[in-house]
Design a protein with these regions (language model features):
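Alpha-helical solenoid repeat scaffolds of the TPR/TPR-like class and their adjacent stem/linker regions
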Residues: 1-328
């Protein structure tokens, strides 16, 4: 009807809240329109209210069980809630209903990467290439997977392809810059970070990567303006720089603390208390690190492991990194 069409046009103009109010009034009058519930759910998805989005996508799917777009969008909401396996199940449902559903294949790859199922993610992106070979997002996402697998040559080729397809692709410049920095090509990294800033300068830690890379080669050009930019960002709680890097740049404990708090990613809830524990003859000590390989951290801690009193302690080391060498 006319009211629905009006709401849809408002929605297309990006007036999310205004469209949402009209959709809410309309759903009270009808409970049979799957598109109406889908669009209402989408406004909540765009507003980052993911629980409500899922609730209304559910209602849309209840009305039309073969609605591929609803499964895909519900999968996005689940992904945003870090329910990666559940999101993959929805993307699979969407793909089953619409085999050549590009967005669902792409979204599935992103969720698989977050579960560290890298080879399955690569397969999803390869399916995307078959459907839309000139989409730069695919190659950028592929590059990020190859970086995590340590396959830097393939990562570089994929970043290059993404940038070739989209000269203004800030994410690809930033990713390639980090790769160049990792591979000890600081001048190329600096160029990519600066290109990123020209296009889009609000990536987390972008300015920190730039100034740290410049410091490595004693490039002090624009040093004061970069410091000012970083400090001003930290003041408004933006993720500007790694806390350890900031320590070497300014003497300001308050900003050091803010940077540390912003960098800390709370993965799990802390246990309230340990009520029951077994009585053991030895105390078990576990060391967790992603650097227990041929890395300075391991070599600096080897003596700690060696000098524990084995009659009193059982010592365990848990390696969470990807690199494999003779030390892992």
């Amino acid at each position: 009807n006319e009211i629905f069409e009006k709401a849809f046009k408002i929605h297309l103009k990006g007036k999310i809240k205004e469209a949402q109010k009209i959709y809410l009034k309309l759903v009270k009058k009808t409970e049979k329109n799957h598109n109406l519930f889908f669009l209402l759910a989408t406004t909540y998805l765009q507003s980052e209210d993911y629980d409500k989005a899922i609730n209304f996508f559910n209602k849309s799917i209840d009305i039309k069980s073969n609605f591929a777009d609803a499964y895909n969008n519900r999968g996005i909401a689940l992904y945003k809630l870090k329910m990666y396996q559940e999101s993959i199940e929805d993307f699979n449902r969407a793909i089953k209903l619409k085999e050549n559903y590009f967005d669902a294949h792409l979204n599935k790859g992103i969720s698989l990467r977050n579960l560290r199922k890298y080879y399955e993610a690569i397969q999803s992106y390869q399916n995307c290439i078959k459907l839309k070979s000139h989409d730069a997002k695919i190659y950028n996402n592929l590059a990020n997977v190859f970086v995590e697998l340590g396959n830097y040559d393939k990562a570089l080729k994929s970043f290059n392809k993404a940038i070739q397809l989209n000269k203004n692709y800030a994410e690809a410049y930033f990713g390639r810059g980090k790769l160049f920095s990792l591979n000890k090509h600081p001048k190329l990294a600096i160029k990519d970070f600066e290109n990123t800033i020209k296009i889009k300068d609000d990536f987390d830690f972008l300015y920190g990567h730039l100034i740290h890379t410049k410091m490595r080669i004693c490039d002090w050009s624009n040093y004061e303006s970069l410091i000012k930019k970083i400090v001003n960002g930290v003041k408004i709680n933006k993720k500007m720089i790694d806390p350890f890097c900031l320590l070497s740049l300014i003497d300001d404990p308050k900003k050091h603390r803010i940077t540390s708090e912003l960098s800390f990613n709370k993965q799990t809830e802390l246990p309230s208390s340990i009520k029951n524990f077994s009585q053991l003859n030895k105390i078990k000590i576990g060391y967790f690190s992603g650097d227990l390989c041929d890395h300075a951290i391991l070599h600096l801690t080897l003596d700690i492991f060696k000098h524990h009193d084995k009659s009193k302690f059982d010592v365990y080391a848990f390696y969470s990194g990807l690199k494999e060498d003779k030390w892992t």
